[in-house]
Amino acid sequence: MLRSTLSNWREYLTPITHTSTFETTGQLTPEEFVKAGDYLVHMFPTWRWNGTDYNNVSYKDFLPKEKQFLITRKVPCKLRASNFVETQTTETRDVGDGWELEGQSEGERESGREDTKSNEEALASNIEDLQIVDDDESEGGGDEEQLLQNELADDDDDIVDIKPSTLRYYDLYITYSTSYRVPKMYLCGFANEGTPLSPDQMFEDIAPDYRSKTATIEPLPFFKGNQISVSIHPCKHANVMKVLMEKVRASRHRARDTEAQKNAEEDWEDLQSDIDDGLRVDQYLVVFLKFITSVTPGIEHDYTMEGW
């Protein structure tokens, strides 16, 4: 709990900045956090803002009262994190601050500790098929229907026999961390019959590599009560997000180059050559949820539909 207490003091003492450094640091201002939250709620209706129906909320004056935190309830968790680890045979290496990467030799571990940038790139490279679909792209009925069919096919491939005793549910919260200027995730778990999970039980759903370094037991900071949760420490979020943003930019740039080459062969003029291929700040939380799954592999975050 000492770590939690120190974290709370740091949150309290860190000054708020309203100057955007999103593209250079991967950090967000409170205003950008609200924009990203609005986009997440729009694209994924299972997420919502806290609204005005909470009488026990501890408000932060730099955020709108109705947008203090994001919440999605009763997210299923069918398997413990250890089930996912057992299927992996690759080694992992520590990249500092609790993050670990797969497939590295002992020699690479030593050199990796000296190269923070390559560590973050390797962590980001573990996230496959990173694609963001803009609003206008997701409105096409045919494409959306095909995406849904693909998702259902993937779900069929992953069907396993789940015993009721192993099924759990989580309420997930995302709030703004003033000390790191990034989103911060909190998890509150429940057994299948609705009984709150103990901290030790919730830690069973955190990937083993992250339990002692990245996850912290602490009360939900935005409630006046003492509701215990497990938080995901945000110390590396900004750096990893920077790498993921570059990954999105490179992917879009390649796609645009391919389209431009096709247009050139067909004598079409490329009217989109000056479009920025980077990640928009309002799309930040969609990518954030994508890499949070490396910490909570069994929790079925709602990030795989319209926004990808």
From Swiss-Prot:
Region ranges (Flexible region): 83-159
Subcellular locations according to the entry: Cytoplasm
Active site: 235 (glycyl thioester intermediate)
Domain of life: Eukaryota
Disruption phenotype: Impairs the formation of preautophagosomal structures.
One Gene Ontology molecular-function label: Atg8-family ligase activity
Pfam families: Autophagy_act_C (PF03987)
Keyword hit for Cytoplasm: yes
Region entry Handle region, spans: 239-283
Keyword Transferase: no
Alphabetized UniProt keyword annotations: Autophagy, Cytoplasm, Protein transport, Transport, Ubl conjugation pathway
Miscellaneous comment text of the record: Kluyveromyces marxianus proteins are shorter in length and have a more ordered secondary structure than their S.cerevisiae counterparts, which might contribute to the superior thermotolerance and solubility. K.marxianus could be therefore useful as a new model organism for further elucidation of the molecular details of autophagy.
Protein known as: Autophagy-related protein 3
Phylogenetic placement of the source organism: Eukaryota, Fungi, Dikarya, Ascomycota, Saccharomycotina
Gene that this polypeptide is encoded by: ATG3
